[in-house]
Design a protein with these regions (language model features):
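Outer-membrane beta-barrel initiation region
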Residues: 75-80, 89-93
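Surface-exposed loop/interface segments of Gram-negative outer-membrane beta-barrel transport/assembly proteins
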Residues: 1-68, 109-116, 120-212, 228-230, ...
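Outer-membrane beta-barrel channels and translocator barrels
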Residues: 82, 93-94, 130-132, 220-222, ...
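Extended, hydrophobic alpha-helical segments in both membrane/secreted and soluble proteins
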Residues: 121-123, 229, 274-276, 341-347, ...
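Transmembrane beta-strand segments that form the barrel wall of outer-membrane beta-barrel proteins
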Residues: 102-108, 357-369
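Outer-membrane beta-barrel architecture
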Residues: 86-90, 101, 124, 214-216, ...
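Conserved interaction-surface patches within small, structured recognition/assembly domains
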Residues: 82, 86, 106-107, 343, ...
C-alpha cells in the first residue's frame, strides 16, 4: 500500500485584493466594468458619484483581509491510495512444471471519480508427456477498469475559476454551487465553471478484458527430426460509457437542444494463429552441420465495434442505463476481418563452426489483397 499526493502546485495568484484589482483593470480595458461591479463591487452603478475615484479604496476595504480559495488544493489536495497484491504458486515434478500467478493493482485518483483497477491471472505449464513428446501452455486473462472524468477538462477549470466570489457569491456558494451560468450569463468571456461540480457532473468508465493462450506440442522422431504444432488465440473486449448530467457545462450552455448527454461504445476482437514446422538437424563428418526447416502457418483476425451518442436525456437518475430516453445524436458500427496463409522453407549449412550459408524460400497469401493478387 502507498499514498500519493500532489507533489507541486502551480504558482498562481492567491491575494484576493490583487486579484480583484486585476479583474477591474481587465474590465476597464475590455469595456465590461458594469459586469465587474456586479460581481465584485456590490453592483454599484458605474455612473454613480465616486465610482472611479474611490474604486481602489473600496477594493482595499473589502478584500485586504479576505481569504482566497485555493482551487488546486480543493480539487487535488487529498491523498490517493495505491495498492498492489501478488500471489504466485509453483509446483510440479521432474517432467512437469506448473506456475500460477494472480496480480491486482488498484489506484485511486487525486481527483474524485478517477481511478484505475487491473487484475491479471496467468498460468504456465511445461511438461514432457512421454519420451520425445513435450507440451507447453501459457495462458493469461486481464481485466481492467478505468474511471475518468468524461468531458471534464481538468486544469482548465481549476485555473480559470475565480479565487473569490466577490460580493456576488459567498465562499460556500463558490465551493458547492455551479457558478457557470451566472458568470457566463453576465459576460461571455467569463467561462469559469466550478471544477468540483463539473467533475461530479461528467463521468466516464472504460472496462476492458483480454484473454490469450499459446500452446505447442513437439515430437522427436527418426533421431534427427522434430515436428512442432503451435497455436495461439487472443480475445479482446471493451466497453466505454460517459454521462453528463444537468450540472455539466454542456447542459447549462444549451439545456433544450443538448441537455444531458451520454454515450456507449463496445468493441470486440479475436485472432488466432496455427503454425506447423518440421525441423531436421544432422552433422556429417563432425564439420558439416545441416539444418532444414519446413513450415506452414495460418492466421486470422476479426473485429467489430458499435457506439451510440445520445442527447436530451430527461432523467439524471437513470444515467446511461436507459439510452432509449434520449435522442440519438450519432451512431457508428464497424466490422473487419483478414487472414494470411504462409509456407516457408529455410536451409542452414555450417562448416567447421566458422562458415555459415543460409537460404530461405517463403510464400504468403493475404485476404487484404485484391482477388488474383493475393499471393
Amino acid at each position: 500500500f502507498s499514498f500519493d499526493k500532489l507533489a507541486k502546485k502551480l504558482d498562481l495568484m492567491s491575494n484576493v485584493e490583487d486579484f480583484v484589482k486585476c479583474q477591474y483593470e481587465f474590465a476597464e480595458l475590455t469595456g465590461i466594468t458594469p459586469t465587474w461591479s456586479a460581481f465584485y463591487d456590490d453592483g454599484m452603478a458605474t455612473d454613480a458619484t465616486g465610482f472611479y475615484t474611490g474604486v481602489y479604496d473600496r477594493i482595499h476595504e473589502r478584500y485586504a483581509d479576505a481569504s482566497s480559495i485555493d482551487w488546486q488544493d480543493e480539487v487535488f489536495g487529498g491523498y490517493a491510495m495505491t495498492q498492489s497484491h501478488n500471489v504466485n504458486i509453483s509446483t510440479g515434478t521432474e517432467k512437469t512444471q506448473v506456475m500460477l500467478s494472480y496480480n491486482y493493482n488498484g489506484q485511486d485518483g487525486l481527483l474524485a471519480n478517477h481511478s484505475a483497477n487491473k487484475s491479471a491471472f496467468r498460468a504456465k505449464i511445461n511438461s514432457e508427456l512421454y519420451k520425445g513428446i513435450r507440451l507447453d501452455v501459457n495462458a493469461m486473462f486481464n481485466n481492467k477498469s478505468v474511471d475518468g472524468g468524461g468531458s471534464y477538462s481538468g486544469m482548465k477549470y481549476v485555473l480559470r475559476q475565480p479565487i473569490s466570489g466577490g460580493t456576488y457569491f459567498t465562499r460556500d456558494q463558490m465551493l458547492t454551487e455551479q457558478t457557470y451560468v451566472d458568470f457566463r450569463g453576465a459576460e461571455s468571456s467569463y467561462t469559469a465553471s466550478n471544477p468540483l461540480i463539473q467533475n461530479e457532473a461528467s463521468t466516464s468508465n472504460k472496462r476492458s478484458r483480454m484473454f490469450s493462450v499459446n500452446a505447442g506440442l513437439e515430437f522427436d522422431f527418426l533421431k534427427h527430426f522434430t515436428y512442432r504444432i503451435a497455436g495461439s488465440y487472443r480475445w479482446n473486449s471493451s466497453k466505454s460509457t460517459s454521462f453528463s448530467d444537468e450540472r455539466s457545462t454542456g447542459y447549462l450552455m444549451d439545456p433544450v437542444n443538448t441537455g444531458m448527454t451520454g454515450s456507449i461504445g463496445n468493441s470486440e476482437s479475436y485472432s488466432y494463429q496455427i503454425t506447423n514446422t518440421l525441423n531436421y538437424n544432422q552433422t556429417f563428418a563432425k564439420k558439416h552441420k545441416v539444418n532444414l526447416l519446413l513450415g506452414h502457418e495460418v492466421s486470422y483476425s476479426e473485429d467489430e465495434s458499435n457506439s451510440i451518442s445520445v442527447k436530451q436525456m430527461p432523467y439524471p437518475n437513470h444515467g446511461i442505463d436507459d439510452i432509449s430516453l434520449g435522442n440519438v445524436e450519432e451512431k457508428k458500427s464497424g466490422h473487419g476481418h483478414s487472414g494470411i496463409v504462409s509456407a516457408f522453407l529455410r536451409a542452414n549449412y555450417t562448416f567447421d563452426e566458422r562458415y555459415l550459408l543460409t537460404a530461405t524460400l517463403r510464400a504468403d497469401g493475404s485476404s487484404k489483397f485484391a482477388k488474383g493478387h493475393q499471393w
